[in-house]
Amino acid sequence: MACGATLKRPMEFEAALLSPGSPKRRRCAPLPGPTPGLRPPDAEPPPPFQTQTPPQSLQQPAPPGSERRLPTPEQIFQNIKQEYSRYQRWRHLEVVLNQSEACASESQPHSSALTAPSSPGSSWMKKDQPTFTLRQVGIICERLLKDYEDKIREEYEQILNTKLAEQYESFVKFTHDQIMRRYGTRPTSYVS
């Protein structure tokens, strides 16, 4: 099969090559105005939970020639903290929606279906302290990975032993069939 690639000519050459009566179409010029992804500074901020803006350190591009810096432990901690709080809000909304669906399916109104933010059940949202340190999270992840690896290793050994037993049985059956074919129904003797 043949494969080809074409390149669009740069804009500065188009004016020289294309005359007004040319049958070729001209390139579309971009419209003046703001780009679709950017909004003017006086515009209102986007509603929460729809778009998330990255931290200031990630928004600004690094100047050319400078090294890309890795995030500091504090930045990692802040990112994990933000993700955890988002996860908690998401779980809380999921619980509230499940409770409201259960109440709607029962056709009985419950006043406790939707908990108010001031109720004691949602006090965990007020506390924004981490449950685990970064080191503890690393240790937990290592332990989970080790357990998962051990489980996979056991399953692999079990499957391998099963296949080996099947292969041995087929070998014994094949050998028995070959012996029966060769010697038939003759009585076996110790002298050959």
Curated annotation (Swiss-Prot):
Location of Phosphothreonine modifications: T72
Composition-biased stretches (Low complexity): 50-60
GO biological process per UniProt: myoblast migration involved in skeletal muscle regeneration; negative regulation of satellite cell differentiation; negative regulation of skeletal muscle satellite cell proliferation; positive regulation of lamellipodium assembly; positive regulation of macrophage chemotaxis; positive regulation of myoblast differentiation; positive regulation of transcription by RNA polymerase II
Phosphoprotein found in the keyword field: yes
Short sequence motif Nuclear localization signal: positions: 23-28
UniProt feature, compositional bias: Pro residues: 31-49
Expression tissues: Widely expressed with the highest expression in heart, liver, placenta and peripheral blood leukocytes.
Compartments, record wording: Nucleus
Chief subcellular location: nucleus
Modified residues (Phosphoserine): S22
Chain intervals for the UniProt region annotation (Disordered): 17-71, 104-127
Alphabetic keyword roster: Nucleus, Phosphoprotein
GO cellular component, one term: nuclear membrane
Any one Gene Ontology molecular-function term assigned to this protein's record: transcription coregulator activity
Motif range (SYVS motif): 189-192
Biased composition (Polar residues): 104-122
InterPro entries tied to this protein: Akirin
Additional facts recorded: 'Akiraka ni suru' means 'making things clear' in Japanese. The name is given based on the presence of the clear nuclear localization signal.
Main function: Molecular adapter that acts as a bridge between proteins, and which is involved skeletal muscle development. Functions as a signal transducer for MSTN during skeletal muscle regeneration and myogenesis. May regulate chemotaxis of both macrophages and myoblasts by reorganising actin cytoskeleton, leading to more efficient lamellipodia formation via a PI3 kinase dependent pathway. In contrast to AKIRIN2, not involved in nuclear import of proteasomes.
Protein family: Belongs to the akirin family.
Protein name: Akirin-1
Species per Swiss-Prot/TrEMBL record: Homo sapiens (Human)
Lineage: Eukaryota, Metazoa, Chordata, Craniata, Vertebrata
Gene expressing this chain: AKIRIN1
